[in-house]
Each structure stands twice: as C-alpha cells, then as structure tokens.
Amino acid sequence: MTEKIHIEELPITEKFMRQKRLIQDRGELALIEDGREFQHLGYFSLKKGKGYYRGGHYHRRKVEHFYMVSGRIRVQLVDLDTGKKSEVVIREGQRVTIYPNCAHRFEAEEEAQVIEYYNSMYDPEDDIPYKDF
C-alpha cells in the first residue's frame, strides 16, 4: 500500500477521549475530529453496483479526510510519484486521510455513508480526473 493514505480506527470506548466512538442502546456518537481546522464538509453515500464509484481523480495540493459512517468501500489507489497501484478496504468507524498525488476511486462492497472534509475551499482546478486504476 502507498504511504499516501493513512487509515485509523476510532476506538470504541466509554472513556473521555477527543476522538472516539461511543455505541449505546440509544445509538452511536462519533467524535471524529477535535482541534483540526477545516473549510469544507461534505457527505456522500455510495451503493454497491456495477460501474458505481466515486472519485476517480487526484489532487496536487489538497489533503482529504474521510470518516466512514457505515458500510464498506474498496479504495483503489495509485501513487503518482512512484506509479505503485494498491487497494484497501475501509469500513465503518475508520478515519482515512489521502495525501496529494494519490489517485483514488471508491467502490462500495456494501452500501456506505461517508463524511468528507478538508482544510480548503473546493477548487475545481485541483480535482484532476484519473482513469488508469
């Protein structure tokens, strides 16, 4: 796997922590970030199906963060500095960071809900299509 992706499991705990998941009979609370600044916050869902994907691009400057609310997604990655291709499966409760010059495409293994955030406004010139996964 490329060094341009970082995956972190948010711990499930009753203890006070700035980043965690709390699962109770009444529902779930996820403390995703605390202290990080961001200017863009988005949400997307992705259904399983032939030809259904999100992404298919890379960024020269933007560092993207994602939180998996539910489901499982196969992420196809290409490190554009080394040419190395890899895949990883991300799932509910994981926080993911994708760094610049890493082409990425998401395909659902099961229907998924995802929060996306980053510390810049959306810049269409930094959303560069990529197809060679």
Where are the language model's segments positioned?
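His/acidic/aromatic-lined binding-pocket segments of jelly-roll/cupin-type domains
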Residues: V63-M68, V88, V96, R105-F106
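Short acidic-glycine-tyrosine-enriched beta hairpin
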Residues: L80-P100
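Double-stranded beta-helix
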Residues: R105-F133
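Short beta-strand His + acidic residue motifs that chelate non-heme Fe in jelly-roll/DSBH
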Residues: L29, R54-G55, V75-Q76, I98, ...
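Glycine- and acidic-residue-biased ligand/ion/polar-headgroup-sensing regions
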Residues: R61-V78
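Tight coil/turn sites that cap or link beta-strands
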Residues: K48-G51, G93, Y99-N101, E111
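A short, N-terminal "cap"/entry segment at the start of jelly-roll beta-barrel domains
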Residues: M1-H40
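Conserved short histidine dyad/triad with adjacent acidic residue
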Residues: G42-R61
